[in-house]
Amino acid sequence: MEQQKQKKRKVVSKSKRTQSKSASSLPLDLTSEILLRLPEKSIARFRCVSKLWLSITTDPYFINLFETRSPRPSLLVCFIENDKLFVSSIPQHLHSLQNSKRSYSSSQLFIVIIWNYQKDVGLICFKTSKMPIVWNPSKRQLITLPIPRLSWNNIIVFLGYDPVEGKHKVMCLPFRRSSDVCQVLTLGPAQEFSWITVKTYHKHCSDYQSSGRCIKGVVYYIAQVYHTHAWVLMCFDVRSEKFDMIKLHADIYREILITYEGRIACVEKRTTKDDYIALCILEDAKKDKWSSKDILAPFGHFDERLRTFFQLKGCTHDGEFIFVSSTFRKMDYILFFDPVKKTFRRFELKEIADDQARVNNGDPYGPIFAFCAFLDHVESQMSLQ
């Protein structure tokens, strides 16, 4: 009997060695390709399977490739109520609009900062007074970065991404204070966080946090030149960490920058007033060349309140413009406008408002501290821990 047990143990042990050898003999590129086809939650769970899988799924190349292959981007809607952050992920494309997936988390840190943010490649960056914070909604992780400069009483933060080297960088400027330097931090292991000083060579100040956008490795934001007080578009190359400056048209919303057909665009002030979306599109940064485009959008025929209570948040990869109100008190839906088909569609906020009512004494339209929407959000495998 004892000999049979020993023989059985040897067979089992041999079987395990065979399986282990078979698994380890699988080519790395094939293993990576299989993992890339899995959903984000499955990848997170499979990291504990082996050190090899952990190494593959945390490699920057894998993370960048996963993000480019992610399903269609979503509209991330956030609002704060009673110190809680509510997050809802809404598919932007038409066929899945009714099937929104929701997740909720809470943090005391969000109470004063949600209006002041930057987003890029699955990560969101914002700040509380002097402290920059980076948030990965997909992994429900956030990390507080070191204070850039003690002498800066308040700051503005921008998040940039270099697609060539696959690096995220946080850049920081003093809020409403002219400066010819900025602080830059490259995201990586938490123990290696450190700011470096970068000369801008253009003394300027900016207080329009929401105007920042990163396109093809360049961070754009609106600022005012120190000596002339002229409004300009500042450009920060994430990879080389060099600055440039472009002249701006006068009659634009200085708090709004959008991405339109892969280019940076400003929004003129006559937008919505004349049933047009009026854009100034940057064609050539080196030559300060801009083009104008008027897109007919009959807001008044759809809802007269659009002229007053809605703000253009941007243009999706599919070419739809998205308009969002700053509070549930004024509007109860998010508006999608297709400029090609000249059609409007709306996503009702009723379900989100119902969730709010549970924490607001049954009133679904009570006061909300902040309401924000992030376009073209994709899941990110980057760990902040």
Curated annotation (Swiss-Prot):
Pfam families from the xrefs? F-box, FBA_3
Enumerate the spans annotated as F-box domain.
Answer: 20-69
Annotated Basic residues bias: 1-19
The domain of life for this entry's organism is Eukaryota
Classification via CDD domains: F-box_AtFBW1-like
Q: Where is this region: Disordered?
A: 1-24
Under the heading SMART domains, the entry gives: FBOX (SM00256)
Protein name, please?
Putative F-box protein At1g47765
